Curated annotation (Swiss-Prot):
GO terms for molecular function: acetate transmembrane transporter activity; symporter activity. The gene is mctC. GO terms for biological process: plasma membrane acetate transport. It is found in: Cell membrane. Belongs to the sodium:solute symporter (SSF) (TC 2.A.21) family. GO terms for cellular component: plasma membrane. This is Monocarboxylic acid transporter. Disulfide bonds: none annotated. Induction: Transcriptionally regulated by RamA and RamB. The keyword Methyltransferase does not apply. PANTHER family: CATION_ACETATE SYMPORTER ACTP, SODIUM/PROLINE SYMPORTER-RELATED. Keywords: Cell membrane, Membrane, Symport, Transmembrane, Transmembrane helix, Transport. It is a multi-pass membrane protein.
Length: 551
């Protein structure tokens, strides 16, 4: 992603809002949500409670929680900022994130809920050899989770830097550390049940807050969408930003400003689109939400509710993005601490002053906390349930032991994400999440689809698909311009970029599918026809799925 949506290296203070008011709203929100977590998360000693909340949520509740889990800092901060600077090309993120839900609904939501219990690996290993598949699946889960966590931590750093007018790197790092610590506390104290309620609260606040901002944006420009778009073009035309970049301001209304200049950028767009559209169906923290409802019917209802909320949200990001372009302007956005990631809070300030900015920013902060808590639960399940219980203890560990290992994992993964999030604070969060989607679509999706729909698929194919997708995606990201080779890279002073695309999906996703196919053909059959037949029946009917426990 080019420098237009990266943090300005010599950012100029925007000086908006009231830092004391902002931090006060944050503290109140943390106290309220922590109280909710403590009240609903008292019973988390058993693995069923800790990982899935006892599968006791209704479809409507879970739909709210899915929306809360999915609508991350990238969705709010990153996309609004990307649209404000790149126009239509920034909106491509909204389109990709939303279309991805149709893939998840059509291909994986119901069969995954019917076959699995706690984690993605439950499905992948159902008719294959447990240990190698669970280890591979856990590696894929942890890699995707870490990438996603890094994005949320970076978003938190950018957000609070704007709100508290913090410019020094060390204090921004402290902010990221505090977010990580609060996230760890949410998960340790509340498990999946506490985390789910936080996500439900956050979904209502976020969609409601964005709806209010959308209405106020139209009121502020005194017209409809056409007026808004014309104002955005005029603001770009008068900006130093457009003059420096050398583009026609009307380009913000059409495709190609960011991804249409060369063959490489066009291929990068295709790669990004593939990653976004296929990534959701392989995101472990989203897939895990299907296990928190008692039946497949409720799982389908969950996804329906989620699609309605998520679709409405992404339509409104179009208005907010162009609203930020028209009312704030690209010069002020790029000069703020956080650059593109600061566009939404700056727009809130223009619409309603310091108090409204504090409230919207608290919602954005809630977005970060809710998503990182869900990610931490997923990582803890991968280690506690898949590796410790199934591999190390051969399925003989007690539920209390699994939960203890999972809680230790939450602390470790939280600390790692804090460190990596600090290093990635200069990156646009939508771009970082797109990398997580690419890893998910490469490492997880091929194996999930093969497991559910190809009877001959075997352990060799599963392991080959996961590791090929995971390693190729990570290696190509490391060798891409996103990490080195230009001023906007993660390591701006170095240059080892030999892969031209910033997103690896175009190469790594097909590689994983091919590896799974070849591995199945050359590997030995698992001779588990009975389990394959049982899996097919369960995936279609839900027979044998664990019922919700009574709470």
């Amino acid at each position: 992603m080019n420098s237009t949506i990266l943090l300005a290296q010599d950012a100029v203070s925007e000086g908006v809002g009231n830092p004391i008011l902002n931090i006060s709203v944050f503290v109140v929100f943390i106290i309220v949500t922590m109280t909710v977590v403590l009240r609903v998360g008292k019973s988390t000693s058993e693995s069923t409670d800790f990982y899935t909340g006892g599968a006791s949520f209704s479809g409507t509740q879970n739909g709210l929680a899915i929306a809360g889990d999915y609508l991350s800092a990238a969705s709010f901060l990153g996309i609004v900022g990307a649209i404000s600077l790149n126009g239509y090309d920034g909106f491509l993120y909204s389109i990709g994130f939303f279309v991805a839900w149709l893939v998840a609904l059509l291909l994986v939501a119901e069969p995954l809920r019917n076959v699995g219990r706690f984690t993605m690996a439950d499905v992948l290993s159902f008719r294959l050899r447990q240990k190698p598949v669970r280890v591979a699946a856990a590696c894929g889960t942890l890699a995707v989770t870490l990438f996603y966590l890094i994005a949320q931590m970076a978003g938190a750093g950018s957000l609070v830097s704007v709100l508290l007018d913090i410019h020094e790197f060390k204090w921004q790092a402290v902010v990221v550390g505090i977010v990580g610590i609060v996230m760890i506390a949410y998960v340790l104290l509340g498990g999946m049940k506490g985390t789910t309620y936080v996500q439900m609260i956050k979904a209502v606040l976020l969609v409601g807050g964005v709806a209010i901002m959308t209405v106020l944006t139209f009121v502020k420009v005194s017209g409809g969408l056409t007026t808004l778009l014309n104002d955005a073009v005029e603001k770009h035309a008068a900006s130093d930003y457009a003059a420096t970049k050398g583009y026609d301001p009307t380009q913000i209304l059409e495709p190609g400003l960011q991804y249409g200049a060369t063959l490489t950028t066009q291929l990068d767009f295709i790669s990004l689109a593939l990653a976004l559209c296929l990534g959701t169906a392989g995101l472990p923290h989203v897939l895990m939400r299907f296990y928190t409802v008692p039946t497949a019917k409720e799982a389908r209802k969950s996804v329906t509710w989620a699609i309605v909320l998520i679709g409405a949200f992404y339509l409104m990001t179009l208005v907010l993005g162009y609203g930020a372009a028209a009312l704030v302007g690209p010069d002020r956005v790029i000069a703020a601490p956080g650059a593109a990631n600061a566009a939404a809070p700056l727009l809130a300030f223009e619409l309603g002053g310091s108090i409204f900015m504090a409230l919207i920013s608290a919602v954005a902060f809630a977005t970060v906390l809710a998503v990182v808590a869900g990610l931490a639960i997923t990582a803890s399940a991968a280690v506690g349930h898949d590796i410790y219980n199934a591999v190390i203890r051969n399925g003989q560990s007690t539920e209390a032991e699994q939960v203890r290992v999972s809680r230790i994992t939450v602390v470790v993964i939280g600390l790692i994400s804090i460190v990596l999030g600090i290093l990635a604070m200069t990156q646009n969060v939508a771009f970082l999440v797109a990398l997580a989607f690419a890893v998910a679509a490469s490492a997880n999706l091929p194996t999930i689809l093969y497991s559910l729909y190809w009877k001959k698929f075997n352990t060799t194919g599963a392991v080959a698909a996961i590791y090929t997708g995971l390693i190729s995606a990570l290696l190509l990201i490391f060798l891409s311009p996103a990490v080195s080779g230009n001023d906007s890279a993660m390591v701006p002073g170095a240059d080892w970029a030999i892969f031209p695309l910033k997103n690896p999906g175009l190469v790594s996703i097909p590689l994983a599918f091919i590896a799974g196919w070849i591995g199945t053909l050359v590997g030995k059959p698992d001779n588990m026809d009975d389990l394959a037949a049982e899996m097919e029946v369960r995936s279609l009917t839900g027979v044998g799925v664990e019922k919700a426990v009574d709470h």
